[in-house]
């Protein structure tokens, strides 16, 4: 029977595997490995229903406890967290399911506290539970094991922003070390903006031009207004084509030019921006994980600005200034590490929300 199951698994015939296991084993005598496999098959089968997903979570939980913190326990725990994350907001029992994950996670801590995989899955668990202190603790554990890198440095900064318990001095000192990891890409030399030109090209770079993201409510009218002036507007999306949606399409038509770079390398993005001869490049994502902010460690355009998506300094030397006002930057200005241009009234331009979000 095991050989048959193996062949079915290779053929990805998950429904057949479920039938085979249930026909030849009972809940009582079924070993942890088969419970875990049942969970994987229920979660992976085509046409999976909410009921299938809940059964899969139950199988992972059973496998975890039957294996008594062996390797299968770790596999089942990770699968449980992964499936909870996949279900997302569609699943009404999301929080309850994640609380089960957390219970198992804490029970496994003594055995797996130094295991990188265990720690990594803790990041996802505490992200969805909105337990930011616990998530920061896990990030620091990984950094302690592997050293600081771009991904975990970004996660640490982003999570820390939710807590707001870093002083600006602490933040900028960390960012100085973090920014040393960013590469400098090949770029042609550029000259200053010719203000006398008939058209000045301004580009907005973002990973958030989709899903009714709040960014879109701040820039829609701005883009419309810029089109009435001497500015030529370029939208540069860091998403992949398949990630775009109706929100993207509505935003796309507002720009004079639209470029998708989600599948490009950092060097390719730099090359594209320079070929467009952009005069002013505005980053809308800052240090959030999907933003590709590291390309701003390279001088691509005469003027490079950070605004809106990340309300703090990026600490990168090739960003000329951040846009703010007297309300967003009040104290510790000397610790921002980037010049601050303060608008006289307010730093953003909200367009209003018609629908509840």
Residue ranges and their predicted role:
Residues 1-357:
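Alpha-helical solenoid repeat scaffolds of the TPR/TPR-like class and their adjacent stem/linker regions
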């Amino acid at each position: 029977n095991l050989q048959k199951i193996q062949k079915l698994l290779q053929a990805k015939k998950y429904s057949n595997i479920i039938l085979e296991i249930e026909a030849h084993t009972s809940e009582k005598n079924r070993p942890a490995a088969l419970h875990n496999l049942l969970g994987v098959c229920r979660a992976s089968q085509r046409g999976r229903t909410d009921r299938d997903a809940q059964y899969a979570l139950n199988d992972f939980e059973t496998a975890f406890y039957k294996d008594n913190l062996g390797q299968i326990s770790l596999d089942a725990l990770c699968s449980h967290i992964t499936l909870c994350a996949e279900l997302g907001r569609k699943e009404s029992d999301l929080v309850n399911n994640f609380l089960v994950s957390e219970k198992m996670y804490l029970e496994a801590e003594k055995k797996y506290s130094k295991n990188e995989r265990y720690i990594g899955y803790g990041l996802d668990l505490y992200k969805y539970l909105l337990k930011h202190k616990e998530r920061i603790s896990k990030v620091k554990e990984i950094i302690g094991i592997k050293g600081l890198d771009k991904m975990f440095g970004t996660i640490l900064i982003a999570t820390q922003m939710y807590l707001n318990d870093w002083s600006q001095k602490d933040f900028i000192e960390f960012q100085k070390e973090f920014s040393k990891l960013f590469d400098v890409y090949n770029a042609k030399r550029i000259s200053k903006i010719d203000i006398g030109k008939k058209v000045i090209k301004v580009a907005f770079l973002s990973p958030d031009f989709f899903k009714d993201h709040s960014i879109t409510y701040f820039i829609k009218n701005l883009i419309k207004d810029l089109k009435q002036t001497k500015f030529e507007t370029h939208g540069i999306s860091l998403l992949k084509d398949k990630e775009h949606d109706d929100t993207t399409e509505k935003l796309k038509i507002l720009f004079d030019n639209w470029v998708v770079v989600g599948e490009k390398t950092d060097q390719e993005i730099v090359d594209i921006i320079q070929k467009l001869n952009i005069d002013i490049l505005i980053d809308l994502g800052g240090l959030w994980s999907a933003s590709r902010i590291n390309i701003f460690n390279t001088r691509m355009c005469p003027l490079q600005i950070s605004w809106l998506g990340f309300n703090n300094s990026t600490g990168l030397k090739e960003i000329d200034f951040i846009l703010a006002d007297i309300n967003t930057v009040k104290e510790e200005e000397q610790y921002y590490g980037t010049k601050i241009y303060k608008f006289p009234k307010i730093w953003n331009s909200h367009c209003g929300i018609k629908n509840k979000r």
